[in-house]
């Protein structure tokens, strides 16, 4: 499981590179400052940041490099997800599902409709991520050194 996660991360980093994505210093700073484990009274606390990193035997530079990679892989996934949209036939399918619910209250019907559309879109986005991930496996060279495990 851990090995699969490492391979997937490597592939998504490769995809991000191919897409020309990057992480700005400002993006990285914001992401770190928003992490609750580095906050005190709802605000970023530099001392908590340094102390927690030291407790985990990390330097700020090594942690920030890992964090930047995480942000980059998430950006690559978002590019794929944002490229997905429901087709007219999928909208029609969603409308059919909405009409089957038979909700008479207009407010509840609107909420149900939105939930169904979002659910269908989410499912399609997940399929797109899986398909893209599978296609990357043939393009990205991954070498596993079993003797090092």
List each language-model region with its residue ranges:
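Peptidyl-prolyl cis-trans isomerase
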Residues: 1-149
């Amino acid at each position: 499981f851990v090995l699969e996660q490492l391979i997937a991360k490597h592939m998504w980093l490769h995809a991000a590179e191919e897409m020309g994505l990057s992480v700005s210093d400002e993006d990285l700073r914001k992401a770190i400052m928003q992490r609750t484990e580095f906050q005190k009274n709802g605000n970023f606390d530099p001392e908590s940041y340094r102390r927690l990193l030291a407790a985990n035997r990390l330097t700020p530079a090594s942690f920030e490099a890992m964090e930047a990679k995480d942000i980059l892989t998430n950006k690559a996934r978002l590019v794929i997800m944002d490229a997905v949209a429901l087709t007219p036939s999928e909208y029609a399918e969603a409308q059919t599902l909405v009409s089957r619910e038979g909700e008479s209250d207009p407010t509840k019907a609107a909420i149900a409709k939105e939930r169904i559309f979002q659910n269908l879109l989410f499912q399609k986005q997940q399929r797109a991520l899986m398909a893209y991930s599978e296609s990357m496996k043939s393009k990205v060279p991954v070498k596993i050194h079993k003797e090092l495990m």
